Design a protein with these regions (language model features):
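Short, Lys/Arg-rich, polar N-terminal cytosolic tail immediately upstream
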Residues: 1-8
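Juxtamembrane extramembrane loops of integral membrane proteins
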Residues: 105-106, 112
Length: 250
């Protein structure tokens, strides 16, 4: 009696887990159809209707039920094969990928963002070339910026400081194409590339404090020069790699 009860309870739990897995996969796959398939806003309704029918007829038409597991699997395979590309029209704030050239101790950074802002959305877009001396790399600051008073959410940035007073700020962000708005859900479906922005502090930091009115805090990182150089060179490698191997943000 006791074993029979446990057996039935185990089977019931397995069915619940199977249904939960099917539902989760189906919902996730609906996002793939919506965001990644041509005509997705229309096709997603056909997908939802087909999956609902398969669920409703799972006892009468077990073949349909089994096939409904294969559809999300096929969409997953399709999703994993979608390549990132740099060949899009990008919004001005993310229009150029920076590059870092290192010749001995000379650092040449191209396409450093140095915008002149009048408001958050009204600005003169400027990309410049900056030169630094690797041997003069001295400090690393960690910036934390909170928006809309949300202390539990923040955007983080870095700023590399040099002995001659120069700074090079770094921010890892989503690269938005023209006509596309920021969003957490689209980001889960390969809608945004990742971009490492290299910029003047007057651009990255002032944009947030002076125009977006965010609360920003700056912390000096305790790091020796050898590891500081390694960190800089590591970021430089990642930044340069995006020219040939673009990646998604998520």
């Amino acid at each position: 009696m006791h074993l029979t009860f446990l057996r039935h309870a185990g089977l019931a739990a397995a069915r619940i887990l199977m249904m939960a897995a099917w539902f989760g996969l189906s919902v996730w796959a609906a996002g793939v159809v919506f965001y990644n398939v041509w005509g997705g806003p229309v096709l997603v309704w056909l997908y939802v209707a087909a999956m609902a029918c398969a669920f409703a007829l799972r006892r009468k038409r077990p073949v349909l039920w089994r096939a409904s597991w294969g559809v999300p699997a096929l969409l997953l395979a399709y999703y994993l094969c979608i390549p990132a590309t740099n060949d899009k029209e990008w919004q001005p704030s993310w229009s150029r990928l920076p590059s870092v050239e290192i010749n001995g101790n000379e650092i040449v950074v191209k396409d450093v963002r140095s915008f002149i802002y009048r408001t958050e959305r009204d600005f003169d877009a400027r990309y410049v070339t900056r030169r630094f001396d690797l041997d003069k790399l001295a400090t690393l600051d960690f910036a934390v910026s909170h928006w809309d008073g949300m202390e539990f959410v923040a955007h983080t940035m870095l700023s590399f400081g040099f002995e001659d007073g120069k700074h090079l700020a770094l921010s890892v962000e989503t690269r938005l194409p023209e006509g596309v708005e920021q969003g957490s859900v689209p980001g889960l479906y390969k809608q945004f590339n990742v971009i490492y922005i290299l910029a003047d502090e007057e651009d990255l930091f002032a944009l947030r404090t002076n125009y977006r009115k965010e609360d920003m805090y700056l912390y000096r990182i305790n790091i020796d020069r050898e590891n500081l150089k390694k960190a800089f060179l590591g970021f430089a490698e990642k930044i340069n790699s995006l020219h040939e191997r673009p990646r998604y943000y998520h």
